[in-house]
Curated annotation (Swiss-Prot):
Modified residues (N-acetylmethionine): 1
Species per Swiss-Prot/TrEMBL record: Mus musculus (Mouse)
Disulfide bond residue pairs: none
Catalytic activity: a very-long-chain acyl-CoA + malonyl-CoA + H(+) = a very-long-chain 3-oxoacyl-CoA + CO2 + CoA; eicosanoyl-CoA + malonyl-CoA + H(+) = 3-oxodocosanoyl-CoA + CO2 + CoA; docosanoyl-CoA + malonyl-CoA + H(+) = 3-oxotetracosanoyl-CoA + CO2 + CoA; tetracosanoyl-CoA + malonyl-CoA + H(+) = 3-oxohexacosanoyl-CoA + CO2 + CoA
Name of the coding gene: Elovl1
Protein name: Very long chain fatty acid elongase 1
UniProt keyword list: Acetylation, Endoplasmic reticulum, Fatty acid biosynthesis, Fatty acid metabolism, Lipid biosynthesis, Lipid metabolism, Membrane, Transferase, Transmembrane, Transmembrane helix
Disruption phenotype: Homozygous knockout mice die within one day after birth. Death is caused by a skin barrier deficiency and excessive water loss that are associated with impaired formation of lipid lamellae in the stratum corneum. In the epidermis, the levels of ceramides with fatty acid chains containing more than 26 carbons are decreased, while the levels of ceramides with less than 24 carbons are increased.
Motif (Di-lysine motif): 275-279
Function, in words: Catalyzes the first and rate-limiting reaction of the four reactions that constitute the long-chain fatty acids elongation cycle. This endoplasmic reticulum-bound enzymatic process allows the addition of 2 carbons to the chain of long- and very long-chain fatty acids (VLCFAs) per cycle. Condensing enzyme that exhibits activity toward saturated and monounsaturated acyl-CoA substrates, with the highest activity towards C22:0 acyl-CoA.
Keyword Ribonucleoprotein: no
Subcellular location: Endoplasmic reticulum membrane
Keyword GTP-binding: no
Length: 279
């Protein structure tokens, strides 16, 4: 326990003062409490509350929620690009700019906004529970939604920006596509003919992790790189690798083995019409 406390104090010594005043950023206690409450609700409290209730439809809410996240994700991508990735960054070894220049402060702001978007996206799982789509609350889903906000909190608390922000920009780009799909599918039958690309969603996720891993792996082959926190490089590389394996496993069991294909397809080998599950 003492080692954990010492590690916490050591990490907080490196906290970036520019982000101290942002909501949720004073201490890790609040974000940790939110995530623990989230896990408790989706794994225990939520299913018990819904056990003897009919599922909520939430169609109107899902349409607004998903298209709002499309807009937010687009804005985050734009801000990352304007905060360095289309101006001063080299896309190779890009250290963190700890100055108070307008561009550096813009990067701090969008890094925080990305973290906030991960908190908002916890609603994905709450929607599953309220609609009694418990089968969609997989280990991969829960792990991804609970680990990323917490790890990103520490990332922006200490090192907002630099080459470590690449994966956040790519993730937001993927979420533009993902929430567009969810929003269209929430519209109902009118949008079904345009959702032929459902199977490619996991492929897009896999491409994301390949890009993240390739970009961050450059660090290991550079003669020198003055990025200030190499530990973040190592963690991002681990993140890309672990989630590539998890999503590859999901792809294999969902589509290669056909576990998520309609029963008619599995039995007869012929196409069947099914509703796409939104969000």
């Amino acid at each position: 326990m003492e080692a954990v406390v010492n590690l916490y104090h050591e990490l907080m010594k490196h906290a970036d003062p520019r982000i101290q005043s942002y909501p949720l950023m004073g201490s890790p206690l609040l974000i940790t409490s939110i995530l623990l409450t989230y896990v408790y609700f989706i794994l225990s409290l939520g299913p018990r509350i819904m056990a003897n209730r009919k599922p909520f439809q939430l169609r109107g809410f899902m349409i607004v929620y998903n298209f709002s996240l499309v807009i937010l994700s687009l804005y985050i991508v734009y801000e990352f690009l304007m905060s360095g990735w289309l101006s001063t960054y080299t896309w190779r070894c890009d250290p963190i700019d700890f100055s108070n220049s307008p561009e550096a402060l813009r990067m701090v702001r969008v890094a925080w906004l990305f973290m906030l978007s991960k908190v908002i996206e916890l609603m994905d799982t709450v929607i599953f529970i309220l609609r009694k789509k418990d089968g969609q609350v997989t280990f991969l889903h829960v792990f991804h939604h609970s680990v990323l906000p917490w790890s990103w909190w520490w990332g922006i608390k200490i090192a907002p920006g630099g080459m470590g922000s690449f994966h956040a920009m790519i993730n937001s780009s993927v979420h533009v596509v993902m929430y567009l799909y969810y929003g269209l599918s929430a519209l109902g039958p009118v949008a079904q003919p345009y959702l032929w690309w459902k199977k490619h969603m996991t492929a897009i996720q896999l491409i994301q992790f390949v890009l993240v891993s390739l970009h961050i792996s450059q660090y290991y082959f550079m003669p020198s790189c003055n990025y200030q926190y190499p530990i973040i490089i190592h963690l991002i590389w681990m993140y890309g690798t672990i989630f590539f394996i998890l999503f590859s496993n999901f792809w294999y069991h969902s589509y290669t083995k056909g576990k998520r294909l309609p029963r008619a397809v599995q039995q007869n080998g012929a196409p069947a019409t099914t509703k796409v599950k939104a969000n």
